Amino acid sequence: MGECAKGSNPSIFLFKKGSSIMANKNYKFETLQLHVGQEAPDPATGARAVPIYQTTSYVFQDCAQAAARFGLAEGGNIYGRLTNSTQEVLENRVAALENGAAGLAVASGAAAITYAIEAVARSGDHIVSQNTIYGGTYNLLNTTLKAFGVDTTFVNIHDLDQVKKAVRPETKAIYLETLGNPNSDIPDIEALAQLAHKHQIPLIIDNTFGTPYLIRPIEHGADIEHGADIVVHSATKFIGGHGTSLGGVIVDGGTFDWEASGRFPQFTQPNPSYHGVSFTNAAGKAAFAAYIRAILLRDTGASISPFNAFLLLQGLETLSLRLERHVENTLRVVEFLSRHPQVERVNHPSLSGHPDHKLYEKYFPKGAASIFTFEIKGKEKEAQAFIDHLELFSLLANVADVKSLVIHPATTTHAQLSREAQLKAGIRPNTIRLSIGTEHIDDILADLEHGFAYAK
């Protein structure tokens, strides 16, 4: 276990996919969400639950092993900022559920999105993004990253000509959400993947609201041309599911050919800050995830805590069960709102009149969109009166909890946007965002009716 030989291409074992035990079986999603990453009990104690490895550092057997690990010649934990054994189970499990090559868990969904963009784009580069996205991501792209020299053009992703015209020579990625936040609009993943790959750039998709149980964006790329290359999650939402823990996950699909593109030297050329390693040579299909862990996470440190990783794993074990109930309740609420005399419009793709209804049927055969908006008749006053008199729904900024949630986007989650930008994102003064939980549907509907009584 000596140091990596000069000029060799070390095997970066820090970026492991799920184990061969699970890979060699054709297990279903519901089984994978319980077992990937920990197919056997803890070897030290026999514990069946994933242990919480609450430590910052790891003891090396000797100087030779320490040198080998720091030189990336040997796999294993080095320091808690980069890896942790609880974290590793979460990474492998989400990567397997998304059918990706590697996963990386970080401190929050915002960190996952930031790292995914920073990995491909440098000062002077450009991103094309869907315009109807989460307000925090919009602000990241429109303001924060712009200050570091990364420009973004926001487009109507349903207008392919507009997307094509937005792509420049310096464009490094197209960014989407499988279900737009907050209006649940749906991009045509296959068409946009083809467009991105035609320009030799990756398609990055936030699948927080879709979840791998309802849609796997990478799988639409079975022939490489028709799916996402990178998937990001705010694991805080449906993956955790209980509003207890912050976390984010990046999944490297392993489908994008960084070498053939010739536009991403950070992955293909020797990196002077890491022993001259080329990440495509060292990590192969997991080069993107490897680069983020070894460089961005190392240097900026948005690491997930072992305890949060454990809590997110607990949520992940029931993802399919919860999503079935979320979707069932949501469709009942959509039907209720669509018929309500105090509702001006319901923005949900399950409705036949919704502009994305055909895409909903194509990409979400199990249903989807538990987070959506509707417009109450009236203005901001009526919207806020409705919200303030709900009793079961909690008024807070989170979504995708087992508890039903509500918020007024124009004055909260999307308040940073100008009024013009809000309108382009589908946010109006009378827009209300709902996140439908898993309570009994009769109680949910009764609470909504109670709110309407105070909004007349």
Sequence positions of predicted segments:
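Conserved PLP-enzyme active-site core in the AAT-like
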Residues: 23-24, 41, 102-339
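Conserved N-terminal alpha-helix of the aminotransferase class I/II PLP-enzyme fold
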Residues: 62-111, 136-143
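PLP-dependent enzyme catalytic core of the Aspartate aminotransferase-like
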Residues: 16, 101, 142, 169, ...
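Short, Lys/Arg-enriched N-terminal segments with co-localized hydrophobic residues
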Residues: 6-21
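Conserved small-domain helix->loop->beta segment predominantly found in fold-type I
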Residues: 300-303, 307-309, 318, 323-325, ...
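Short conserved active-site loop signatures built around small residues
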Residues: 23-53, 250
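Glycine-centered tight turns that cap/initiate beta-strands
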Residues: 99, 170, 342-345, 392, ...
